[in-house]
């Protein structure tokens, strides 16, 4: 059983976006719960809170005791069934962090000027650039930095493709002026084939100050630059490597009718029939 669990776990953790599925009634499913948990946290899986429409992120950054997670924006903690990706047991949650002001509290100065929080600035960035996405800002475990997460999913199984965009950043709250992180893009296309795109782009951003608006504007620029870089790469591949691989017809100059493959000599040879 252990080898079966290990094999199944590896399939789960390597599943493309939106394709970590289970079958009802399988005795092995409970043993795979740890693999589903690792998958959900790594992929920034999103779940809907009970009675809410907005999806929130599940990750290692917002995990608390008791296999629960918290969402800063809604000030809620919740449990997760990692196999079904369902949230439950929502409770009020108050963030305790020395960086709470930077994360989600808008500070008004004596001159009555409002300093936006990272969460507010990130929400604006997400609304402008990602039609459907979830985001979060969380303190790191030692409270020396802040984690910024954004995930956008697009599932189109009827058209045989699914995709996910993730970005993860670490913002130090010391004197450092560099935000480090990564952008990950995963796309799976599986109509009449199996094509996958998996990218991992390291990001290092110099910031002039620990200001929410400045940090998010630099992040937005980095994400825009990377998307443009991907677009250029797609064009080059389509006009170069992929074009050279493409063949409209096989060498026989006739299309293979796969549903009639038994009628071909090769099909008959394989099935033990006579060749023509």
Curated annotation (Swiss-Prot):
InterPro entries (UniProt xref): CapZ_alpha (IPR002189), CapZ_alpha/beta (IPR037282), CapZ_alpha/beta_2 (IPR042276), CapZ_alpha_1 (IPR042489), F-actin_cap_asu_CS (IPR017865)
Compartments, as annotated in UniProt: Cytoplasm, Cytoskeleton
Keywords recorded for this protein, A-Z: Actin capping, Actin-binding, Cytoplasm, Cytoskeleton
Superkingdom, taxonomy of origin: Eukaryota
A molecular function (GO) term: actin filament binding
GO biological process, one term: actin cytoskeleton organization
GO cellular component: actin cortical patch; cellular bud tip; cortical cytoskeleton; F-actin capping protein complex; incipient cellular bud site; mitotic actomyosin contractile ring
Pfam family, one: F-actin_cap_A
Function summary: F-actin-capping proteins bind in a Ca(2+)-independent manner to the fast growing ends of actin filaments (barbed end) thereby blocking the exchange of subunits at these ends. Unlike other capping proteins (such as gelsolin and severin), these proteins do not sever actin filaments.
Family statement drawn from the similarity comment of this UniProt entry: Belongs to the F-actin-capping protein alpha subunit family.
The protein's assembly and partners: Heterodimer of an alpha and a beta subunit.
Name used for this protein in its record: F-actin-capping protein subunit alpha
Species: Aspergillus fumigatus (strain ATCC MYA-4609 / CBS 101355 / FGSC A1100 / Af293) (Neosartorya fumigata)
Chain's gene name: cap1
């Amino acid at each position: 059983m252990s080898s079966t669990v290990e094999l199944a776990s590896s399939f789960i953790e390597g599943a493309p976006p939106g394709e970590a599925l289970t079958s009802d009634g399988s005795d092995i499913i409970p043993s795979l719960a740890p693999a589903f948990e690792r998958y959900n946290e790594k992929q920034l899986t999103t779940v809907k809170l009970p009675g809410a429409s907005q999806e929130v992120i599940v990750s290692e950054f917002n995990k608390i005791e008791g296999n629960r997670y918290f969402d800063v924006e809604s000030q809620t903690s919740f449990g997760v069934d990692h196999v079904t990706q369902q949230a439950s047991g929502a409770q009020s949650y108050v963030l305790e962090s020395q960086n709470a002001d930077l994360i989600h509290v808008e500070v008004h100065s004596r001159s009555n000027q409002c300093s936006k929080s990272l969460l507010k600035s990130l929400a604006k960035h997400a609304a402008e650039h990602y039609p459907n996405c979830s985001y979060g800002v969380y303190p790191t475990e030692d409270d020396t930095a802040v984690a910024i997460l954004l995930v956008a999913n697009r599932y189109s199984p009827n058209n045989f493709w699914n995709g996910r965009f993730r970005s993860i950043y670490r913002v130090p709250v010391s004197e450092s002026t560099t935000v480090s992180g990564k952008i990950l893009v995963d796309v799976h296309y599986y109509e009449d084939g199996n094509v996958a795109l998996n990218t991992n782009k390291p990001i290092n951003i110099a910031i002039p100050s620990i200001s929410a608006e400045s940090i998010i504007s630099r992040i937005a620029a980095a994400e825009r630059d990377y998307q443009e870089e991907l677009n250029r790469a797609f064009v080059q591949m389509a006009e170069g490597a992929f074009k050279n691989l493409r063949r409209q017809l096989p060498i026989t100059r006739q299309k293979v009718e796969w549903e009639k493959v038994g009628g071909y000599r090769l099909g008959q040879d394989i099935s033990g029939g006579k060749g023509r």
